[in-house]
Regions:
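Extracellular (secreted or membrane-anchored) zinc-dependent metallopeptidases
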Residues: 1-177
Length: 177
């Protein structure tokens, strides 16, 4: 977690003048036994149930007033999901709301580490939580920021993921759109 946050912070600080800190009592949120953690198995959780499970875990254990953005680092499952776009600092209104604590990233290879994990996934999903939309142009989403050729090449693109790849992995910066 620390290595990933250090890598992501270098980019967020440079590009967004933003610095993220781990909360002091984060140890109560670290689970090392899948049979006792509050999350669905990867084959179910990575399909979207982790969003609400994380939001509920953060709300009950940390309290909404004690954090601004919550993001689950899974061990395996593949991909990620922000839960919402531009929801940083937004508390859930009900127990079924996806708000500031509903993002997750989980690698397909069981190795939540390195630039592919940190940049292509964590920074990308946190970018959504901070309000960023996709910048690739192989598919127009109607957000007005689809400015990069094909699958794109920056953090909010889908480098290496589409049939229209420009490159295999994201460059470590945000496109200006």
């Amino acid at each position: 977690m620390n290595a990933t946050l250090t890598r992501v912070n270098a980019i967020f600080n440079r590009d967004l003048a933003l610095h993220l800190n781990l909360i002091a009592n984060n140890a109560i949120l670290i689970y090392t036994n899948a049979s006792t953690d509050p999350y669905s198995p990867a084959n179910i959780g990575a399909s979207g149930t982790w969003n609400l499970e994380l939001q509920r875990d953060l709300t009950s254990k940390i309290g909404n007033a004690n954090y601004d953005i919550g993001h689950l680092f899974g061990a395996t499952g593949g991909g990620g999901n922000a839960g919402c776009i531009g929801c940083v600092c937004q508390n859930p209104i009900s127990s079924t709301d996806l708000a500031k604590g509903s993002g997750y990233t989980s690698p397909a290879d069981g190795k939540p580490e390195g630039d592919t994990f940190d940049i292509d996934f964590v920074a990308h999903e946190m970018g959504h939580q901070l309000g960023a939309n996709h910048t690739f142009s192989h598919e127009i989403e109607g957000t007005g920021v689809n400015v990069e050729p094909g699958g794109g090449s920056t953090i909010m693109a889908y480098a290496g993921v589409t049939d229209y790849n420009v490159q295999s992995h994201s460059d470590d910066y945000f496109a200006y759109a």
